[in-house]
UniProtKB/Swiss-Prot annotation:
Stored SUPFAM superfamilies: Ribulose-phoshate binding barrel (SSF51366)
InterPro entries in the cross-refs: Aldolase_TIM, PRAI_dom, RibuloseP-bd_barrel, TrpF_fam
Protein name as catalogued: N-(5'-phosphoribosyl)anthranilate isomerase
Keywords attached to this entry: Amino-acid biosynthesis, Aromatic amino acid biosynthesis, Isomerase, Tryptophan biosynthesis
A Pfam family this chain is assigned to: PRAI
Organism the protein comes from: Campylobacter jejuni subsp. jejuni serotype O:6 (strain 81116 / NCTC 11828)
Family the UniProt entry places it in: Belongs to the TrpF family.
One of the GO BP terms on file: L-tryptophan biosynthetic process
Stored CDD domains: PRAI
Pathway in which this enzyme or protein is active: Amino-acid biosynthesis; L-tryptophan biosynthesis; L-tryptophan from chorismate: step 3/5
Coiled-coil segments on the chain, per record: none
Gene3D superfamilies reported in the protein's UniProt record: Aldolase class I (3.20.20.70)
Record field: catalytic activity: N-(5-phospho-beta-D-ribosyl)anthranilate = 1-(2-carboxyphenylamino)-1-deoxy-D-ribulose 5-phosphate
Length: 199
């Protein structure tokens, strides 16, 4: 069963509207980004989504384990999505916290899977100027050689959501293509995506 994540949530009113939609995961960005949230914001947003039985994911880039653990505890995160490599030792510590770990692999022209990955799932995103939220896709045919479950991110919107589904991804991670001019998630665009996925 395909699941959906919407990333880059930062506004509480927007979150209250989003919480009613049939979306499984919501992401809060703790790394440098226009969508970055403070711990206090994340804590408030978590409460909104948990009230509707949604899962919340913290997005990290270079943060150390101590910082990540603090965010997990204070913002009551269900999982983390991380752009740096997680070591076996860190993964074991995170498992004790009862959070899932998604390791991001930034893709340009090939899948860079040389090193061992310690995570519950791999998330493939397009390599861009920012670590995520660039609104660009990579060549999804590269995923044909990957045989394990994965998450797909990067430039997914109404124009290519069916193509994204055809990659076989277990979770689609959507962000910038669902925003209005104020950087808020556009509820109507999300409803259109949900309607399209029922076809």
């Amino acid at each position: 069963m395909l699941k959906l994540k919407i990333c880059g949530i930062k506004d509480e009113k927007n979150a209250k509207d989003l919480a009613f939609l049939n979306i499984d995961f919501f992401g809060f960005i703790f790394a440098k980004s226009p969508r970055r949230v403070s711990l206090e914001q994340a804590r408030n947003l978590s409460a909104i989504f948990h009230e509707k039985d949604k899962k919340v994911v913290g997005v990290f880039v270079d943060e150390n384990l101590e910082q990540i653990l603090r965010c997990i505890k204070e913002a009551k995160l269900d999982g983390i999505q991380i752009y740096r490599t997680i070591t076996k030792e860190e993964f074991e510590i995170l498992k004790v916290q009862n959070v899932f770990v998604w390791q991001v692999i930034s893709v340009e022209n090939s899948l860079d899977l040389k090193s061992e990955i310690f995570a519950n799932l791999v998330l493939f995103d397009a390599k861009g100027i920012l670590k995520g939220g660039n609104g660009i896709s990579f060549d999804w045919t590269l995923l044909g050689s990957y045989t394990k479950d994965f998450i797909l991110a990067g430039g997914i919107g109404l124009d290519n959501v069916h193509k994204a589904v055809q990659t076989g991804a277990k979770i689609l991670d959507l962000n910038s293509k669902l925003e209005d001019e104020k950087g808020l998630k556009d509820i109507n665009k999300i409803k259109q995506i949900l309607k399209e996925l029922k076809k």
